């Protein structure tokens, strides 16, 4: 009988100790699903002067020409770029990276959100492999598709909802340049409003961080550099998160925005992105204002305005500490890279995280253990070659 365990999501740990996030690498993933390690080709640079707002920028412009390459990816949840970046770092240092859990920021955020959201709003369907003393966590691609289909069905999705999603990508397109300002021709700057908006190219920062005694490596998509990039240095302090939302017009809107800001804070604090920039649009999708928030000041801001949401920041950290500690306690980890890999399923249902070991008779077993559903053969061989 394999490992099986449940964790009630209303439980909290006592730890609030966080390790300072540090960038250990980065890569670009292209719209053609190529992974360019230590390559910042897809890194964008923030540029949105206040004067631009006077132009009444239309965030719905270009909706019909939107290109979503991401939906056609063969494996949109792939750990390949993350693993190749880790291997590159290990080859440089000649030793295995010191970490307990390796995954994406989005997965860590989903697990933390279990303490605040229902399974219908926050679908969690993860696979975990225990290899070489570390846990590698990946989302099931089918779960991503199902979650999107479910939310679309429940909401009675219409063109306005697709348009609202598009305005987020449009805001990013209007607010960023592909190169630093000094290297960007005036013609490119002036024609930004005409650029075709697409979704597929990504720049990913790979960050070492931790909570309590658990050390994590998280991959996180970065929207842009706010000021300048330092070559060969940790650039976390220069990154910014871009978001777009509806104007705040009344108390109800305020509470809705506070909940959004909490989720954005969660995204940013996990990997140490210090700056959040929100664009606010009116009912006609015109960009009206842009506001900047300091990630570290968001908990204080929320606490002063809405104590209930403000207390969620500390609750999130306590739950983060507990759930990572629980995973490390429940899942056996053998340091020997030649030992048998073990695979597990983690889902969120009925107010519990449910962990179960995947047995040899399960149809997923072969792909997770012997195949490349999570770990590539190249990465497994690399680890076996490390002394």
UniProtKB/Swiss-Prot annotation:
Positions that bind a divalent metal cation: 172, 223, 241-242
The protein's Enzyme Commission number: 3.6.1.-
Region feature (Interaction with RAT1): 273-387
InterPro entries: RAI1 (IPR013961), RAI1-like_fam (IPR039039)
Localization (cell): Nucleus
Modified residues (Phosphoserine): 198
Keywords from the UniProt entry: Hydrolase, Metal-binding, mRNA processing, Nuclease, Nucleotide-binding, Nucleus, Phosphoprotein, RNA-binding, rRNA processing, Transcription, Transcription regulation, Transcription termination
Cofactor: a divalent metal cation
An annotated GO cellular component: nucleus
Cofactor binding note from Swiss-Prot or TrEMBL: Divalent metal cation.
Subunit structure: Interacts with RAT1, RTT103 and pre-60S ribosomal subunits. Interacts with RAT1; the interaction is direct, stabilizes RAT1 protein structure and stimulates its exoribonuclease activity. The interaction also stimulates RAI1 pyrophosphohydrolase activity, probably by recruiting it to mRNA substrates.
Function: Decapping enzyme for NAD-capped RNAs: specifically hydrolyzes the nicotinamide adenine dinucleotide (NAD) cap from a subset of RNAs by removing the entire NAD moiety from the 5'-end of an NAD-capped RNA. The NAD-cap is present at the 5'-end of some RNAs and snoRNAs. In contrast to the canonical 5'-end N7 methylguanosine (m7G) cap, the NAD cap promotes mRNA decay. Also acts as a non-canonical decapping enzyme that removes the entire cap structure of m7G capped or incompletely capped RNAs.
Family: Belongs to the DXO/Dom3Z family.
Additional facts recorded: Present with 4030 molecules/cell in log phase SD medium.
Protein name per the record: Decapping nuclease RAI1
Gene behind the chain: RAI1
